[in-house]
Amino acid sequence: XIFPDNFLMGLGKKGNLVYIIDFGLAKKYRDARTHQHIPYRENKNLTGTARYASINTHLGIEQSRRDDLESLGYVLMYFNL
């Protein structure tokens, strides 16, 4: 779940650094043994913040890396406003 509260700015000499926190909902996307992609599941409940969730998430499709990029896009639009 990517949303604005997960991005922190450094202080002082590290003021140009962005820290990303809270990987509580992170999951593996490839099987460690076979290196095959783990199939998506459907009929999943919404996880994370609805405002920044991808369209697939709203449709009940399990989140993937693609959905993380879509959510990041929504967060960047939020920061721009």
Swiss-Prot record:
GO terms for cellular component: cytoplasm; nucleus. Gene3D superfamilies: Transferase(Phosphotransferase) domain 1 (1.10.510.10). InterPro entries: CK1_Ser-Thr_kinase, Kinase-like_dom_sf, Pkinase_fungal, Prot_kinase_dom. Residues 1-81 form the Protein kinase domain. It is found in: Cytoplasm; Nucleus. Keywords: ATP-binding, Cytoplasm, Kinase, Nucleotide-binding, Nucleus, Phosphoprotein, Serine/threonine-protein kinase, Transferase, Wnt signaling pathway. One of its GO terms (biological process) is protein phosphorylation. Its main location: cytoplasm. Monomer. Component of the circadian core oscillator, which includes the CRY proteins, CLOCK, or NPAS2, ARTNL/BMAL1 or ARTNL2/BMAL2, CSNK1D and/or CSNK1E, TIMELESS and the PER proteins. Interacts with DNMT1 and MAP1A. Interacts directly with PER1 and PER2 which may lead to their degradation. Interacts with MAPT/TAU, SNAPIN, DBNDD2, AIB1/NCOA3 and ESR1. Interacts with AKAP9/AKAP450; this interaction promotes centrosomal subcellular location. Binds to tubulins in mitotic cells upon DNA damage. Interacts with GJA1. Interacts with FAM83A, FAM83B, FAM83E and FAM83H (via DUF1669). This is Casein kinase I isoform delta. The lineage of its organism: Eukaryota, Metazoa, Chordata, Craniata, Vertebrata.
